[in-house]
């Protein structure tokens, strides 16, 4: 019986997530990131329902990986064919045609010659398909459509209704229980699905709690002088609400005298090449699972810890770092600048331990040397941090650019900081 490995790849993630102005960014960035994960999760549900795969254990067995805007499914004949693939792609294209983001399907027939060649072919197929997004809806690309705020049914503006719902659900305490989303995706009611599967439980964002609120009031009482300048504060400091970027910058100012926001991006080097050396789909699935566990569980553990910043001040990461995107092999964080630097150092140490554990695990025969991370950090003026720039430069003023290459290599735990002031026109 022929078997097929199906890949779903969300295209345009970075442009979609960061196409937001600074005002409201704390509300919307995580919501947009969560929407990306919702696309892959509901696409997997749709495909498994389509092939009548009902048993939960069987569904888990078919799903190799889901994270970072990608998923991999194992299907067999006769449940899968090229015609079925075209029908699924057409359905997803029609659903997402007005969503500023797309889901690209690719597949490869698994051979007896080894998984590495199958993986190479799947990568080539995926890269080709990315060149023609929404190709099944070509005629519809040239028809008028509204901006997504219409109340009517249909596919127009899925993401706007869903992101608006998620923005409030994720940033304001108890709001999820008090409202209905009015949005659907791939035939599922978003609010109902999230409720049934507890998908908003465990989502980490920096939140106000009583000890923090008391500490803030105590600090203000001890330091009665007025603020040096206005701050970009949008969300009420109320227990359970998300801490916005203006307050994160303010916390950094209290500790260091400088109210900057740090932005950290990390990803694993040459991960696709490593997957291409896997000898079997079993090892591929196991490695994918380990990577996903690290980026989801280990990072959540680190965010719950304390650390010392460059000045010896104790920082609680949970009050100072906003994880925008944590995927299967990469992640993106925004936070108080001193907390971001301290967190990057902690991540360095944790990833080294993880990378060494893979080398020493006999289950991963293809992992012969430790994986490495590459990372970059910028420190920006939080009042001018416009994330909506289409050209990727942003409307912010970059104060420091920090390069962290091959994060996991070598025995030296260091971050190189290149100092300089660069405005967005000079990037």
What does each of the following model-derived ranges do?
Residues 1-427:
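Regulatory and interdomain segments flanking nucleotide-handling catalytic cores
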């Amino acid at each position: 019986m022929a078997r097929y490995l199906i890949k779903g790849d969300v295209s345009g993630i970075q442009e979609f997530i960061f196409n937001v102005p600074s005002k409201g960014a704390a509300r919307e960035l995580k919501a947009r990131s969560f929407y990306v994960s919702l696309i892959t999760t509901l696409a997997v549900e749709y495909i498994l329902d389509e092939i009548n795969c009902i048993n939960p254990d069987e569904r888990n067995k078919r799903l190799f990986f889901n994270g970072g805007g990608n998923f991999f499914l194992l299907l067999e004949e006769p449940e899968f064919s090229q015609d079925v693939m075209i029908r699924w792609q057409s359905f997803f294209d029609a659903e997402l045609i007005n969503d500023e983001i797309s889901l690209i399907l690719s597949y490869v027939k698994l051979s007896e010659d080894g998984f590495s060649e199958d993986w190479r072919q799947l990568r080539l197929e995926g890269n080709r398909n990315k060149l023609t997004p929404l190709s099944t809806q070509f005629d519809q690309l040239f028809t008028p459509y509204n901006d997504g705020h219409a109340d009517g049914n249909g596919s127009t503006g899925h993401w706007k209704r869903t992101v608006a719902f998620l923005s409030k659900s994720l940033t304001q305490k108890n709001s999820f229980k008090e409202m209905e989303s009015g949005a659907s995706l791939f035939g599922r009611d978003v609010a109902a699905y999230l409720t049934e599967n507890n998908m908003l439980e465990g989502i980490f964002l920096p939140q106000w709690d009583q000890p923090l609120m008391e500490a803030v009031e105590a600090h203000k009482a001890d330091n009665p002088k007025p603020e040096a300048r206005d701050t970009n504060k949008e969300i009420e400091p109320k227990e359970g609400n998300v801490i916005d970027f203006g307050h994160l910058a303010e916390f950094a100012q209290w500790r260091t005298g400088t109210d900057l926001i740090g932005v950290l991006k990390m990803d694993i080097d040459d991960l696709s090449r490593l997957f291409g050396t896997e000898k079997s789909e079993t090892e591929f699935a196991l490695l994918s699972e380990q990577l996903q566990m690290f980026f989801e569980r280990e990072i959540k553990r680190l965010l719950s810890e304390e650390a010392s910043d460059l000045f010896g001040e104790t920082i609680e990461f949970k009050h100072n770092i906003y994880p925008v995107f944590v995927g299967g092999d990469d992640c993106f964080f925004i936070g108080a600048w001193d907390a971001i630097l301290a967190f990057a150092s902690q991540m360095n140490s944790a990833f080294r331990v993880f990378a060494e554990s893979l080398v020493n695990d006999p289950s991963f025969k293809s992992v012969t040397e430790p994986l490495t991370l590459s990372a970059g950090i910028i420190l920006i003026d939080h009042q001018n941090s416009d994330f909506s720039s289409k050209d990727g430069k942003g409307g912010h003023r970059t104060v420091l650019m920090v390069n962290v290459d091959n994060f996991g290599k070598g025995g030296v735990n260091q971050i190189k900081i290149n100092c300089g002031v660069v405005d967005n026109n000079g990037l």
